[in-house]
Amino acid sequence: MGQFIKIKVFTDKYPFLGPIIWILSVQYFIVQIIVGVAYKYSYSLRFNTISDLGNTSCGIYSGRYVCSPLHNLMNASFIMLGLTMALGSLLIYQEFRKDRGTLVGFSLMAIAGLGTLFVGIFPENTISLLHTLGASMPFILGNIALIIMSLYLLLPSPFKIYTFVSGVIALFFLILFKTSLYGSFGIGGIERIVAYPQTIWLIFFGIYMTRNEYLKRSK
């Protein structure tokens, strides 16, 4: 127990590549701010979904007015986030003890990344079925991945608790989101409670791995 294996692919000379890739997920939040500010009329964090920022047309969509001049930037951000989730999962997995739990956890996060890729490739007003399928993958699989990794990764107790709680809260609000029980959060607010925790976790986990002794233990 406690045995770590160094990354054998891509990162023998660059051991922080995986964590840095996950830290780059911060671009997702930066781009949302930029695209939201450029939104025609008023973009509401409560009543507009994240995907509205990537909608390629102007007009009424699902009862909401959408018009995002920088939709291409937002969709590129979705694609980049998906790539960082998937590639980072592949690289960082190599740093941990190989067991079924870590394999399943990182695999689910990688698949969630592929789903996020779909969100950017197929904006909500194009092939809605593929967009919805793509969005469901990080919403469901990404948050399940957090719970699994909280149970199997060798992490300090506070970080394990943070990881577990992030996944549980997001899945709870996902149920409310899917049953249209938005309450005072609105559709946009409740969607963000579902979507943001795992992305914030990716950033924090990347920072954590670059600043602690994990990589040193693998020497």
Regions found by a protein language model. Name each.
Residues I21, S25, M80-L87, I140-M149, ...:
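Hydrophobic cores of alpha-helical transmembrane segments in multi-pass inner/ER membrane proteins
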Residues I148-K219:
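Terminal transmembrane helical module of multi-pass membrane proteins
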Residues M1-K13:
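Short, Lys/Arg-rich, polar N-terminal cytosolic tail immediately upstream
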Residues L87-G113:
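Cytoplasmic juxtamembrane regions at transmembrane-helix boundaries
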Residues M109-M149:
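Membrane-proximal helix-loop-helix units in multi-pass membrane proteins
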Residues Y61-L91:
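Individual transmembrane alpha-helix segments
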Residues S42-L70:
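Extracytosolic (periplasmic/ER-lumenal) interhelical loops and adjacent juxtamembrane/interface segments
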Residues D12-S42:
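N-terminal signal-anchor transmembrane alpha helix
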